[in-house]
């Protein structure tokens, strides 16, 4: 991309930093994950968790959610202004699972938010360390992406449920900053904008007055974030139109849905980073690893290395498959929910199966589930190879793709053909090319029609042996293009409900 020079790397977004050189980036990212690790160790001490309990992913998630809730300024302010029965606005908590007499028991804990903020700051050299908080949000978002389908949300905004490969980061809170914006898919941004426009259609005061001015600024900023994800001039020009609209309405919604569809072939660039559960960083810190000194990258070999050497456990329900539970968490750790399964399988070294074939529900356990029958299992999060995470959508190319998901959003920078179902996608583009965006629409459709099979993405990029930390010997895998590559193919994954 031509504008590469003006962009901050993810890591700079991630750590809120200005331009830094590679070593500075590695050490500031190291400082961030080291802080998460120190915080986790301290929380385990507070709750008197055994080593085994501290490695339980469900306990990790509870602790992560508590610190996110403790720092959620807007929600905390809202809770104080609108007291609701039985909710103490100054406290946060969740389920902690403990091993007692050969059984798992659930204990609900409550903690002062102030106390959690103190522990978090203490673990992060007295700073608020918002980058670390965002990192945890992205890990939760990646876990949601791998676990749930967003069919209902897509349909509600007038989009096609088969566009699920564009929905990365759809459950990220708005406060997740630049690092959060970087990992949001095209569909996620489109959905946020459509929701906003719909509110404006239904509420005449939405764009008016002092509040309306702020709303307008937010609208234009979201438009610019989405524009930055597109790689072709016509798509960007169309985003300018949407942004500059005096009174956004149905025409803009149409344009946005058109753009989302076009992204199935003319892919946007969406960042991918491996964000691991807090307990993994905690384990490494506890074993004496100095993240800041050694440096760390979210997009290189480091997360793979960390997972090779970490033992994480998970609660498992009676009829769930332990290997499937591991796959779900592995995909979440590498933000690979929308990656081609053939690529994921090759890197992981074991077959990665579509969501519909997994015998496992989500990682989190609902409060009404029976603990008597719960068991625990070791998650297998190791990999055979590693690959660099990408921030580009790659060029595109035609292959057979599936009924459920008709495109992929690459996670790993690996040379391959990118599957998509041209006939299915193009069928959506009949009709409307009139109106003020007609020339751009025509141009976009022309580009989609001429996307050629030989345009492989990521020329020459490959996977690497885990011993090859400098990425010197790429192995370019060959994929069997005749079988299925989509994760949400013909799927029955649960819906995500807030």
From Swiss-Prot:
Listed GO biological process terms: symbiont entry into host cell; viral penetration into host nucleus
Q: Where does this protein reside within or beyond the cell?
A: Virion; Host nucleus
Q: What protein name does the entry list? A: Nucleoprotein
- Which family does the UniProt entry place this protein in? Belongs to the influenza viruses nucleoprotein family.
Q: Where is this motif: Bipartite nuclear localization signal?
A: 198-216
The record's keywords, sorted A to Z, are: Capsid protein, Helical capsid protein, Host nucleus, Host-virus interaction, Ribonucleoprotein, RNA-binding, Viral nucleoprotein, Viral penetration into host nucleus, Virion, Virus entry into host cell
Q: How is it modified after translation?
A: Late in virus-infected cells, may be cleaved from a 56-kDa protein to a 53-kDa protein by a cellular caspase. This cleavage might be a marker for the onset of apoptosis in infected cells or have a specific function in virus host interaction.
Q: Coding gene?
A: NP
